Amino acid sequence: MAKQNTHLEHLEDDILNQGSRGGFNAIKFLNELGVMLSEPRSSMRVTTKWDGAPAIICGKHPETGDFFVGTKGVFAKLPKICMNDGDVDVLYSGELANKLKDCLKYLSKLPIKGVLQGDLLYTNDKVIRKVGDQQSITFQPNTITYAVPKDTDLGKKIAKSKLGIVFHTSYSGGPELRDMIPSFGVDVSKMQNVPGVTVFSSDFNVKDATMFTPQDMTRYKSAIKKAEGSLKQASKFLDILKTSGEGKFMLAPMFKIYFNTYIRQGKTFPSADAVTRGFTDFYTQALDKEIALKKQESTKKKYIKMKEDGLKFIKQNSKPIYMTVASYMNLTAAKTIVIRQLERVKGIGTYIRTDNGFRVTAPEGFVAIRSGNALKLVDRLEFSRANFTVEKNWG
């Protein structure tokens, strides 16, 4: 069964998800992105990652041919599929239910073949406000606020529409929804003249991007070489890491949670050495918290032993853990060079809402697609931190 596009992973997280294979994959992606930004022969595709919510899956049901909508729950073992308002009332509630009813009403008008996945951008929650020195139509589906000048062609189109969505993934095959095969990228050119709906494209036109200068390319190749060097030393340990630990205290997922604590707190990584030392404290605190929750003495002993074994493993593998942290940081550094280059392309205005008004920000990020596989390119400190703190408009 194919894996649906329910969650894309960050490029640097691939070493924690797939071990040494993930490191090899991340380097392949980075090298191909370098080709894409320096010469016209790249097979790499890039899409813009819109900060829409909720995720919407819709189209013709592969078994019945009837139009349906739903969230990512359509791929569950007990799929939550809505073919009419009654289904929505049974399966959903609140503002999400209202938005899904709008999706049924308006997306069913689109010439959709098969099944598409996208992100909802707005329904009845558009707001006209002054952003900078222009009156703009704004919508905030999740963390980022999008702003389009009111008097432009796109602004007028959005003003007339009842719903806005961006599609990024198509599905084909069957016989059931969960058996369908995803393909990244959707041609939305034939969906542009349907009354009441504005369909945005996620495609990123690389021709609009500023190419790397020779100096840029030298700096970028140096960043990749640095990542390759640390990965070479971390490679064997990354494969051990995937199978180390027990239950929710498997070490690879714990490293992901640990790295994310820096982002939640709005902190950049200090040195690789400091991050490595900090993981011991993080692991200790997580196990101590779990031990304190246990009532039975036998269960407490189990987790006390797990903690002791884990700390012993961490101490014995301090150097490979250091190289793992260094690899993560080096991959992030190389990825950031690409992000900054892609961000130079001007698109729809993107802002973060603050207590003092709106602050200009970059798009959420990009998705790099290579040989049917996709990884996220996101400035996590900028976007993900805001994602944890900015109040959302739907629930």
Regions found by a protein language model. Give the residues of each.
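Core nucleotide-handling region used for phosphoryl-transfer chemistry
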Residues: 2-44, 49-54, 58-395
